[in-house]
UniProtKB/Swiss-Prot annotation:
Species annotation: Mus musculus (Mouse)
Designated name of the protein: Xaa-Pro aminopeptidase 2
Subcellular location(s) of the protein: Cell membrane
Main localization, broad class: membrane
Record's keyword terms, sorted: Aminopeptidase, Cell membrane, Glycoprotein, GPI-anchor, Hydrolase, Lipoprotein, Membrane, Metal-binding, Protease, Signal, Zinc
Functional summary from the UniProt entry: Membrane-bound metalloprotease which catalyzes the removal of a penultimate prolyl residue from the N-termini of peptides, such as Arg-Pro-Pro. May play a role in the metabolism of the vasodilator bradykinin.
Catalytic activity of the protein: Release of any N-terminal amino acid, including proline, that is linked to proline, even from a dipeptide or tripeptide
Entry comment describing in which tissues the protein is expressed: Strongly expressed in small intestine, heart and lung. Also detected in testis, skeletal muscle, spleen, liver, kidney, brain, uterus, eye, lymph node, thymus, stomach, prostate and bone marrow.
Membrane topology value: Lipid-anchor; GPI-anchor
Main enzyme class: hydrolase
Lipidation (GPI-anchor amidated alanine): 650
EC number from the UniProt entry: 3.4.11.9
Amino acid sequence: MAQAYWQCYPWLVLLCACAWSYPEPKYLGREDVRNCSTSPERLPVTAVNTTMRLAALRQQMETWNLSAYIIPDTDAHMSEYIGKPDKRREWISGFTGSAGTAVVTMGKAAVWTDSRYWTQAERQMDCNWELHKEVSISSIVAWILAEVPDGQNVGFDPFLFSVDSWKNYDQGFQDSSRHLLSVTTNLVDVAWGSERPPVPSQPIYALPKEFTGSTWQEKVSAVRSYMEHHAKTPTGVLLSALDETAWLFNLRSSDIPYNPFFYSYALLTNSSIRLFVNKSRFSLETLQYLNTNCTLPMCVQLEDYSQVRDSVKAYASGDVKILIGVSYTTYGVYEVIPKEKLVTDTYSPVMLIKAVKNSKEQALLKSSHVRDAVAVIQYLVWLEKNVPKGTVDEFSGAEYIDELRRNENFSSGPSFETISASGLNAALAHYSPTKELHRKLSSDEMYLVDSGGQYWDGTTDITRTVHWGTPTAFQKEAYTRVLMGNIDLSRLVFPAATSGRVIEAFARRALWEVGLNYGHGTGHGIGNFLCVHEWPVGFQYNNIAMAKGMFTSIEPGYYHDGEFGIRLEDVALVVEAKTKYPGDYLTFELVSFVPYDRNLIDVRLLSPEQLQYLNRYYQTIRENVGPELQRRQLLEEFAWLEQHTEPLSARAPHIISWTSLWVASALAILSWSS
């Protein structure tokens, strides 16, 4: 799944500083977006009335003597996906986009979001809200300074601000006479009242031993060893990200959409283990699993989730040093640790240790990808039969591939919202259809499906782009060049400890040669029944160096605005490279096992090395997925796989007829019965 990155250079900040608006002229006259320039104002049926919500929040602001209140789109753990109780910006503004910040003053309200969501915001917000289109913290601060008088307070919930975000806001207000005030009571929650969705209370369970790479005791020992050998010898480490506690204790639940996590913190010291969580969610069996009935170094002491700030403050009063990973720690716990007792790294030891999978974890992830490939192949076969009938749309397609995954063994649902995009919608890198808004799939258009699953043995993420008709020469070239980029990076041999950003350009080279490019990241880490976007692995500037045992996606793309989009994404394991001469070198081994669309490949563009690599990959797909299809007697899918993984050559035909598929199916049946 592609991850976008947005940045604004200094000159652009100056240009955009005042780039806020009510609906632009291009929206006027449209009934699907708001028009605040008329009297009375015209709102679409999708707009949310926020007048009473804002009044309730402003009443709380008055109680706390605040002239402005900042509402980010995060939770207390800096999660990528957030639960319903944490969708505070969505509730107060009506805007449901995944990225954006709201600020409310006593007289105005504004939302900042990027270009992916501008139209959506105009459809969902009423005229109480301004829409700002420059998303930097500096632009938010500039607006607040213009709206809030000297000497007034600007409030925020410290549990919703990362350490770095707080520093940026604090720096912005330093030279002004406004005061940035930490308020641990969330005022939106108070205004929301009884209508706020309850915090989940489903059971927290321990993963069966066969689905874990190490026991939780072994993991705790590894983290303590890391602390012991750390240059600043911390006595404890605070874990704030939800995947950290889930991984450390081999525990899972369902508090967060698409992620098997539960609200929690952990404070691990040399001699104790504290897990901050809702204790009522554990069964007696799980309590015994965690050794909660003792106080020895390998016993887990359960404390209430809400007590983490006070407990960390109490621990910090002793002769201690506390290590935190600032990327996922909020200011809410950071501010109670004296600076002389604080040890800061970008990432916690848990983040670094779990990034490198051991041999069992590698085997588990691979097995999940084999079953996942079966589901994707079933989907592609189904599409080939049904799209020409005109019976499939983007939304029904997304529902069907999710259903196919749910039917797989050890499935726990999708790993993110399926991106099912036809034609021009595929040019939007993060488009997802809805029941109300979607396009019908057509044999005359390209179709992009980016999807993934959560299984007890692994998390998956794969993107394929297909065309069932006659693609244009440009579409074939663009697709082939995206494929060339995928191959060039996947087959690359590089020195150990190389940063992903150093080699990322290999995925873009074939596109750059003809003046094409893409605007999202090239890849991200992936977990074992954890995050589909698992930091700190990947190809961006703030990712750690590549190491044997890491998993990353490789996903170049190309997006032709208003016409089509292409992305080819595979998950790869970092392995030792076999080189002619001795040396410490690495390469990638793909664990996604679904062939690319032969109808879109211009083999003439591929080098002999690229073609050889592609054919070897196809042989690997046959060896890994073929037996599973045969075992399940999925005859049609097996025939499809055999046809679509036939070796390619410069003169090989690329289009496969359904007649040939049925012939292959018959031959497969005969071979099994003999």
